[in-house]
């Protein structure tokens, strides 16, 4: 076969593959993405319609699905019912280790969104006081991971307390009704418990809160990298809008949560929105959480946590959020 003919065949194959990739992307008619009250940027994105505006010229619609916690977002991603989901970084790592095919691609917040919470009348003032007590928690979320690490530091384990597994809103209700003694809280519900019922945050550790990250299913990222970049472009527009329109951000959160201005102000006081690129700071924080969970027995000893973190964090799309 002549060199010219071989080059023509190679060119034809390359063109065919490029056409196939374009066709695969063109087949996407709907992007399914979550919104969550623990992710203020997602609420701005939904409310302002930035993503719809970005995609409308290609006839791609947007379907919004609410996530009540990282565990729900991971459940939706694993089931293939959403393409993009909001979680805490450490929760995403647990999902990845458990076989959830996801990539973390963007930072939507650096929050102090979880702490250990109790009522004034319980006498609980430190983590050691939780021994034998009933603690409400949502398994597989940053508050759950935060609780495990706090117990570990106090030389306790989950076996030393009575875990009551509830979704975040039900955890707050259970605490206020007296059904549990403590709660691994999550904002804005935690802020509401503070402001509205005088709940006390008896253990705080901002450094043990992991970053808020946006995740995408591996298959979607592989088949539609250009669309992923466009989603992040819209996300970045929403994040910058939130930073420069703080009063409107507060109003948006009030509208979605049905909570008071005072509660949302408390949430926003401990929510930083100045980061977006995912990289080494997130790797370091998530790795530290993973190693602590492995030491506590939540992650099996034979798991290579560092490899799992490296597999989770995908920096390819970082330029889309600059």
Model-derived regions: residue spans:
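N-terminal export leaders
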Residues: 5-9
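Bacterial N-terminal signal peptides
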Residues: 10-19
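Sec/Tat signal peptide C-region and signal peptidase I cleavage site
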Residues: 20-26
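Short, glycine-/small- and polar/acidic-enriched structural segments
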Residues: 27-157, 162-167, 181-184, 200-201, ...
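Short, solvent-exposed loop/beta-turn-alpha elements that line the ligand-binding surface or hinge
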Residues: 52-60, 273-282, 305
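Pocket-lining segment of extracytoplasmic ligand-binding domains
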Residues: 90, 163-164, 169-255
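Secondary-structure end/capping motifs
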Residues: 222-300
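Conserved C-terminal helix/tail region of periplasmic/extracytoplasmic solute-binding proteins
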Residues: 294-322
């Amino acid at each position: 076969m002549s060199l010219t003919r071989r080059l023509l065949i190679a060119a034809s194959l390359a063109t065919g593959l490029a056409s196939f990739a374009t066709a695969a992307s063109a087949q996407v008619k709907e992007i399914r993405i979550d919104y969550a009250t623990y992710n203020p940027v997602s609420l701005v994105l939904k409310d302002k319609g930035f993503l719809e505006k970005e995609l409308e010229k290609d006839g791609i619609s947007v379907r919004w699905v609410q996530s009540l916690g990282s565990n729900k977002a991971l459940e939706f991603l694993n089931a293939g019912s959403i393409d993009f989901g909001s979680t805490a970084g450490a929760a995403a790592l647990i999902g990845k280790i458990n076989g959830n095919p996801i990539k973390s691609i963007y930072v939507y917040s650096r929050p102090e969104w979880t702490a250990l919470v109790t009522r004034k009348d319980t006498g609980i003032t430190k983590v050691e006081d939780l021994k034998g007590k009933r603690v409400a928690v949502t398994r597989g979320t940053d508050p759950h991971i935060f609780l495990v690490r706090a117990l570990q530091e106090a030389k306790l384990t989950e076996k030393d307390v009575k875990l009551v597994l509830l979704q975040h809103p039900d955890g707050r209700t259970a605490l206020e009704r007296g059904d549990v003694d403590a709660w691994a809280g999550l904002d804005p519900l935690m802020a509401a418990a503070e402001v509205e019922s005088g709940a006390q945050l008896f253990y705080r550790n901002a450094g043990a809160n992991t970053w808020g990250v946006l995740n995408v299913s591996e298959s979607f990222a592989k088949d539609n990298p250009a669309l992923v970049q466009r989603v992040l472009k819209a996300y970045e527009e929403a994040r910058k809008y939130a930073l420069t329109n703080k009063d409107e951000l507060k109003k948006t959160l009030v509208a979605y949560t049905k909570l008071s201005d005072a509660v949302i102000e408390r949430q926003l006081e401990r929510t930083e929105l100045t980061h977006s690129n995912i990289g080494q700071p997130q790797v370091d924080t998530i790795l530290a959480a993973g190693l602590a969970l492995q030491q506590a027995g939540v992650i099996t000893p034979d798991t290579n946590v560092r490899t799992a973190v490296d597999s989770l964090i995908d920096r390819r799309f970082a330029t889309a959020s600059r």
